[in-house]
Amino acid sequence: MVKVTFNSALAQKEAKKDESKSGEEALIIPPDAVAVDCKDPDEVVPVGQRRAWCWCMCFGLAFMLAGVILGGAYLYKYFAFQPDDVYYCGIKYIKDDVILNEPSADAPASRYQTIEENIKIFEEDEVEFISVPVPEFADSDPANIVHDFNKKLTAYLDLNLDKCYVIPLNTSIVMPPKNLLELLINIKAGTYLPQSYLIHEHMVITDRIENIDHLGFYIYRLCHDKETYKLQRRETIKGIQKRSADVCVTIRHFENRFAVETLICP
């Protein structure tokens, strides 16, 4: 009879080899597992910080959109609300308060003065814009004038001094936009109005206006970034009135069937 025996030491050695192989297989980790499971702490963004960044971005976009809308509205009002026609016309008037009774009556040429100006009418907004250029012979000053019937204000911009003057609208002298437009249409074929007379206005400069936002869009556009002052009307008379001081501003214009001389003094 043959007895089969096993070497225990050899069996233990084989068992240890099997355990070491299984251990090596368990320690094998795919290379991409490190990239997925392990991150740099500096690269991790907290959830609260990401939310704050999103809110800031949303508010920034909202402010940008609001600025675009407001800017577009201003540009639309600036460019769209333009008059269809600009009237260039003039008026002849007598230098003194003597008026010719007959249209065909003759008078010395030296007694006539001529006023020429550009007139724009914004009928829907009830605004008149008058541009008085530099006169060739008369001793008056160039100016831009705005009559705003909605705000019931008149603004004068002295182009020599680059200063603005604001006063309540005088409806007894200034013809409403609709009526003035009809008058201009009727005389569009001619260059000058029939001979007329001259009205004198004497105004005094008072307080400075620091904020002109409440004066309306058209006056704001006229007087923006310019020194602006209030005016007080001293008197309105027909006939000759001596100039009180050489420092006064004299503006000759018309927005009616007669001419107006506006004297603005300190």
From Swiss-Prot:
Domain BRICHOS: start-end pairs: 137-231
Pfam families: BRICHOS
S-S bonds: 164-223, 248-265
Single GO BP term: negative regulation of amyloid precursor protein biosynthetic process
PROSITE patterns membership: BRICHOS (PS50869)
Residues of the site described as Cleavage: 243-244
Intervals, Cytoplasmic compartment: 1-54
Segment forming the signal sequence: none
Keyword vocabulary terms for this entry: Cell membrane, Disulfide bond, Endosome, Glycoprotein, Golgi apparatus, Membrane, Secreted, Signal-anchor, Transmembrane, Transmembrane helix
TM spans (from-to): 55-75
Side of membrane Lumenal, spans: 76-266
Subunit record text: Homodimer; disulfide-linked. Interacts with SPPL2A and SPPL2B. Interacts with APP. Mature BRI2 (mBRI2) interacts with the APP amyloid-beta A4 protein; the interaction occurs at the cell surface and in the endocytic compartments and enable alpha- and beta-secretase-induced APP cleavage inhibition. Mature BRI2 (mBRI2) interacts with the APP C99; the interaction occurs in the endocytic compartments and enable gamma-secretase-induced C99 cleavage inhibition. May form heterodimers with Bri23 peptide and APP amyloid-beta protein 40.
Record-stated family: Belongs to the ITM2 family.
Protein name per UniProt: Integral membrane protein 2B
Species of origin: Bos taurus (Bovine)
